């Protein structure tokens, strides 16, 4: 529910629209959304993972990305926040990091920067 309260863009705003019309249904909405919220399952992630966050993301607010990262169960995890980036979360700047990550974890080799 954090993203819904922090974000005023669609698709999250559609849930806010619904709750404005039916505030009494908030508990049911929260219960249903828990089935779809990745944060609820983050502790199950045990494989190596990289997470990139756009600090100006108005679709998935950075606060939710940090919360997700904190809850990830994997010991081998890396966080890459990108200032000045929105929902694309530094995709073009991040591609070299992704390439090195997959080379290391899928191909078993290190790639120099």
Predicted regions and their residues:
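Active-site nucleophile elbow and catalytic-triad environment of alpha/beta-hydrolase enzymes
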Residues: 25-41
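Short, conserved loop/helix-junction motifs that constitute active-site signature segments
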Residues: 44-45, 72-74
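Short beta-strand/loop motif that positions the catalytic acidic residue
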Residues: 45, 51-53, 57
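Short alpha-helix in the alpha/beta-hydrolase fold that links the catalytic acid
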Residues: 47, 61-70, 79
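Acidic catalytic loop of the alpha/beta-hydrolase fold
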Residues: 55-60, 88
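Histidine-bearing beta->alpha loop at or near hydrolase active sites
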Residues: 79-101
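Short, hydrophobic alpha-helical segments
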Residues: 102-113
């Amino acid at each position: 529910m954090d993203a819904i309260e922090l974000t005023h863009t669609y698709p999250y705003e559609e849930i806010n629209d619904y709750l404005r019309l039916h505030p009494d249904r908030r508990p049911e909405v929260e219960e249903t959304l828990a089935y779809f919220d990745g944060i609820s399952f983050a502790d199950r992630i045990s494989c190596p993972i990289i997470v990139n966050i756009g600090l100006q993301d108005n679709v998935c607010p950075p606060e939710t990305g940090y919360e997700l990262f904190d809850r990830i169960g994997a010991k081998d995890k890396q966080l890459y926040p990108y200032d000045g980036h929105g929902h694309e979360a530094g995709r073009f700047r991040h591609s070299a990091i992704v390439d090195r990550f997959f080379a290391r974890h899928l191909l078993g080799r290190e790639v120099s920067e």
